[in-house]
Regions:
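A short, hydrophobic C-terminal helix/tail in secreted or cell-surface proteins
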Residues: 246-264
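Generic N-terminal simple sequence motifs
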Residues: 17, 242-244
Length: 269
């Protein structure tokens, strides 16, 4: 596997050097500071106060885990959304205080979501623990789900959901992938990145907001409390691939072929 990966990296460098420069993807940070805070008094929205917090707040410099994904709005804080079992009267949050983001085909939203105290999946919602619904300027909505142990897990490696498969086993929960973005090794804390692929039909519209609804309840040990926390969010517009442009070496070979063909015709004539 290591040899194959190395070959892939080398091939990518070579192809990148020969191909015409590609347009860069556009990344827009979605500011979360207006929503920092806790859920029902149990979470205050500051990673430094959580287990392993002193190392978690170093994620801007020690994170990424070779994912190549950065979050410019990372600040060591998070937005906590409670589960219904925390009994604070609300378990959903709408974030829409950002300027509309014009979308291209293939646009994605990237996030850092993790659980607190674990969340038992809700069978009434296709076994999702968290539902996230995006809306656009045309009034359309697209719903996605995060499954505990599949695309979301507890931030603390303890007795809750500690696996991260990387995709949902339930396809009805949308095109979502997940990967580890940062961890502090044997200390046991981590932050995980999710990518939501927005509908291609949304190209030309703008992302205007989204709602997070924590439908999972309790935790894997029946402690009766749970929440999900977002540390950072970004919208990524995937750039269109550039038109193929012949390289100078290719043009030279083409010219040589044309000259040779002309000489052959003159000899036959």
């Amino acid at each position: 596997m290591m040899k194959r990966l190395g070959l892939g990296l080398v091939a990518g460098v070579v192809l990148g050097a020969l191909a015409a420069p590609a347009s860069a993807d556009t990344i827009t940070a979605i500011e979360l500071s207006a929503y920092y805070g806790g859920a029902n008094g149990t979470l205050n929205g500051d990673w430094s106060n959580e287990i392993g917090g002193a190392s978690i707040i170093t994620a801007p410099t020690s994170g990424n885990q070779n994912t190549g994904i950065t979050f410019t709005d990372w600040s060591g804080h998070y937005v906590a959304v409670p589960s219904a079992s925390m009994n604070d009267g609300s378990n959903a949050l709408t974030i829409d205080n950002f300027s509309p983001i014009t979308l291209t085909a293939g646009a994605t939203v990237q996030s850092l979501w993790n659980e607190f105290y674990g969340l038992i999946p809700n069978s009434a919602d296709n076994n999702a623990a968290v539902l996230i619904t995006f809306t656009n300027s045309a009034g359309d909505s697209a719903a996605y789900g995060l499954q505990s142990g599949q695309t979301i897990r507890d931030y603390n490696n303890a007795t809750f959901y500690d696996t991260l498969v990387g995709s949902n086993t339930t396809t009805a929960l949308g095109d979502v992938t997940a990967q580890n973005w940062w961890n502090n090794g044997s200390q046991g804390q981590r932050l995980d990145e999710q990518s939501f692929v927005l509908p291609s039909s949304w190209a030309g519209t703008s992302l205007t907001g989204f709602t997070i609804d924590v439908v999972g309840t309790g935790d894997g040990n029946g402690n009766g409390s749970g929440a999900a926390g977002a540390a950072a969010l970004s919208a990524v517009n995937v750039a269109d691939p550039p038109a193929s442009v012949p390289e100078p070496a290719s043009l030279t070979l083409l010219a040589a072929g044309v000259i040779g063909l002309g000489a052959a015709r003159r000899r036959r004539g």
